[in-house]
A protein has these predicted regions:
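Alpha-helical transmembrane segments of multi-pass inner-membrane proteins
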Residues: 2-3, 8-35, 44-46, 50-90, ...
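C-terminal luminal/periplasmic domains and tails of membrane-associated envelope-modifying transferases
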Residues: 2-6, 564-752
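Non-cytosolic membrane-interface motifs at loop->transmembrane helix junctions
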Residues: 101-102, 163-173
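Hydrophobic alpha-helical transmembrane segments in integral membrane proteins
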Residues: 360-369, 534-575, 596-600
Length: 752
């Protein structure tokens, strides 16, 4: 039977537990009768529970002792907080365990499994032991957001993408279900000051590993020139020094060398996590009374602060500045207790940031030079700022087209080509497809509609505003609690500001929802639930149900392993091609929801089929049919995916050209006609998809429509003057046209 919790200081548990606890208390420790006061404060009490310190001044905190199942759930949550930020695939040399995506896919797998463990263990704890269910009206808004996202997913242009999220992003409905679980479980268990502090400490410790690794990736940028100078002028060495403190064998990076990316694989994704690492650690610094721990937290804060600079991500600089301003304002109100060592370490934070910035000023790279990077924030008509505005413009047009339910969560890549401006190809290059808006407000509005976006930010404000009011009110007795809350609050604000210019990924956003849960706990109420006699069958059923998504998660991880192998084996020989194809097909079988897996299968089948046709092999017909079936599956999986039509066109045009070279004009015409007919509506829908337009031009050329093909190629060249393939195709076609004209002009003279 459920009972509402009446008193803030009342303890909940079985009569035996309460009696045993009372007997264990000395007369001096016995709680005094609660006094009703105008500010609703109650006396401090103690409990034998872990994290038993009661902080009544910041809300209706739990006094209930955690059961064994409760402790398991709480520490499982802490384990998740520690593991997810550092989770990545370290097994680069082990072909049996390596995955293609070493970062986001691993973090999402840990989150999916971990959230299921949390949900099931909480349910078992509740059914077996009874206890509190803490609640708040914000649950209704979270439920509304999830329901709205569910409807948006059903009506999405790609329901599978909207549910699972795009490959390496995973910002679909499943991730938001995970966030809701984390938010709920946090509210149930992180209910005392000591537990809150333990959560913050766990996060800070995880950030130490993440930030230290990021620092190692940056250090060679200053050590190499220094050691080269010393070697040249002291030891007369002629060769330059090239240190590599990162022991993992990264290949060519898609961003500037020596930018910190750590366990997130991208500096801009690392930046989001640093919002939590910096500000949560700041709260720990100012709340800690023990000198040794205070020194440790300062060291962690300095390392996090340095990596915030070395990541060279402007979004976290802006977000960090806003978060710091808020933290300073609140700290001025609270007047934290400063130790003498704080002044030195505070100066160390500033000095470390200044030194990192100064060492970059000699760099000619606009990105690596700190001053150039800062000033580029205000240069709206050039560089990445220009492309961001163009992407935002495309997002606004996408929102106008479907303002209610949007296009589906995390589907922006699928619709970007339909709304991108003509100038984007000149700014970013014809191959660049924006898979994210880089503005989370617009990303949400385009994905789940304006209503869904408003629901998300309503949740943010519902938590942030009361938390600010709480942190503004000074309290000498509970100053440590206030410091922790100020750090958590500043982290939430900094991360949300970062998202206005960055990307939301589960590996960082899961912390947002956990911290939101911590901040809302003081405003929650509790309902007491009695144990139930049918706990065993209910628990067994919950475990069996949870095994289904857990199995899917493991299959998806295995699929990415096969996807890696398909790329690693290569296509240098017939046997390697066959092995790669088998691995690609295994990836598609294990995870049929990812377009890029199917595209790889199509690409390998195309190569194998074209070779068979060229050699007039007996299995050419069977391979052709198999490739066509794979193309159909790829296009059906996501009809809006631009690259899918590109891979299909490679096959159709390739087959047309192959049969043309063999003199089979009938088959050549069939494939050129098919390519032109299938690509024509896509060119109308995605007019600035220049790579696809080039394939369309080649199909038109195969049909003999030279003038129309030239018109398409001129559009490509105008769209991106650096599109060399289009320029070469245009010049070659002009040459052919000129030769045909010359031959036609010479024909009458020969007859005479």
């Amino acid at each position: 039977m459920a009972k509402k919790k009446k008193s803030k200081s009342k303890q909940h548990g079985s009569p035996a537990q309460v009696s045993a606890q009372k007997q264990a208390e000395s007369p001096e420790q016995a709680p005094k009768p609660e006094r009703k006061t105008s500010d609703k404060k109650s006396a401090r009490a103690t409990s034998s529970a872990h994290g038993s310190e009661f902080a009544p001044e910041i809300g209706d905190f739990s006094m209930r002792e955690m059961s064994a199942e409760g402790r398991f759930t709480f520490y499982a949550l802490l384990t998740l907080v520690f593991l997810v930020p550092i989770a990545m695939n370290f097994f680069f040399t082990n072909q049996g365990m390596v995955t293609y995506d070493a970062f986001d896919t691993i973090k999402v797998w840990v989150l999916r499994i971990g959230s299921l463990v949390l949900l099931v263990s909480w349910l078992i704890d509740l059914l077996k032991n009874g206890g509190e269910i803490r609640y708040h009206k914000i649950y209704l808004l979270v439920a509304f957001l999830l329901i709205w996202m569910g409807i948006s997913t059903v009506v999405s242009v790609s329901p599978l993408t909207a549910f699972f999220g795009k490959y390496k992003r995973y910002d679909g409905l499943w991730s938001y279900l995970i966030y809701a679980i984390l938010f709920f479980v946090t509210i149930q268990y992180v209910t005392t000051y000591e537990r809150i502090k333990l959560f913050a400490r766990t996060l800070s410790l995880s950030s130490l590993f993440v930030a230290f690794y990021g620092l190692l990736q940056w250090l060679p940028s200053i050590l190499n020139p220094a050691f080269t100078f010393i070697g040249k002028h002291v030891f007369n060495l002629k060769s330059a020094v090239h240190l590599n403190l990162d022991l993992l064998p990264w290949g060519k990076l898609p961003f500037e060398q020596y930018r910190s990316f750590s366990t997130y694989g991208n500096p801009d994704l690392l930046a989001g996590f640093l919002a939590f690492g910096v500000f949560v650690t700041l709260g720990l610094v100012l709340s800690e009374e023990r000198r040794s721990w205070r020194v440790f937290y300062w060291i962690v804060l300095i390392i996090n602060g340095m990596v915030m600079i070395t990541a060279k991500s402007r979004s976290i600089w802006v977000g960090g500045a806003v978060g710091l301003i808020l933290a300073v304002i609140l700290l001025v109100k609270q007047k934290p207790r400063w130790m003498k060592l704080d002044y030195g370490f505070a100066g160390g934070v500033g000095l470390g940031a200044i030194l990192v910035a100064l060492t970059s000023l000699g760099s000619k790279s606009v990105v690596m030079n700190f001053w150039s990077r800062v000033t580029s924030i205000f240069q709206f008509n050039s560089g990445s700022a220009l492309t961001r505005f163009q992407i935002w413009g495309a997002a606004v047009r996408a929102i106008k087209a479907r303002p209610i339910f949007g296009w589906g969560s995390d589907t922006f890549r699928l619709v970007f080509r339909r709304f991108e401006p003509f100038a984007y190809n000149q700014s970013a290059g014809y191959q660049n497809v924006a898979d994210n808006v880089h503005n989370f407000l617009l990303q949400l509005a385009a994905g789940i509609g304006i209503v869904g976006m408003l629901a998300f930010y309503a949740i943010m404000f519902w938590v942030i505003v009361p938390a600010v009011k709480l942190c503004v009110s000074p309290d000498e007795e509970h100053k440590g609690e206030r410091m922790i809350f100020i750090g958590l609050l500043a982290a939430v604000v900094a991360y949300n500001v970062h998202l206005f210019f960055g990307i939301s990924i589960p590996g960082a956003s899961f912390l947002l929802w956990i911290v939101l849960g911590v901040l809302i706990v003081p405003r929650t109420k509790a309902v007491v639930i009695d144990p139930v006699p049918w706990v065993v069958p209910a628990s067994a059923a919950a475990i069996m149900i949870a095994l289904v998504p857990a199995a899917f998660s493991c299959r998806f991880l295995a699929a990415d392993h096969h996807y890696y192998l398909a790329s690693a084996y290569g296509t240098d020989s017939a046997s390697a091609l066959q092995t790669s194809l088998a691995e690609a097909q295994a990836a598609c079988k294990l995870n049929p929801t990812i377009e890029i897996y199917r595209a790889q299968e199509v690409s390998l089948l195309t190569q194998k089929t074209l070779s068979a046709v060229q050699q007039k092999a007996k299995n050419a017909g069977a391979l052709t049919e198999q490739t066509e079936q794979s193309i159909t599956a790829m296009l059906n999986l996501s009809p809006y995916e631009y690259d899918s039509y590109l891979y299909a066109s490679f096959f159709w045009n390739g087959m047309g050209q192959q049969y043309q070279s063999l003199g089979d004009t009938k088959q050549a015409s069939y494939y050129f006609d098919k390519a032109a007919n299938r690509l024509s509506p896509q060119i109308k829908a995605m007019p600035n998809g220049l790579a696809l337009r080039l394939q369309y031009a080649q199909a038109l050329q195969g049909q003999g429509k030279i003038d129309e093909a030239l018109r398409q190629l001129r559009y490509c060249i105008k769209g991106d003057p650096k599109f060399t393939e289009a320029k070469q195709a245009y010049d070659a076609l002009i040459k052919v046209q000129s030769q045909e004209a010359s031959a036609a002009a010479a024909t009458p003279a020969v007859k005479k």
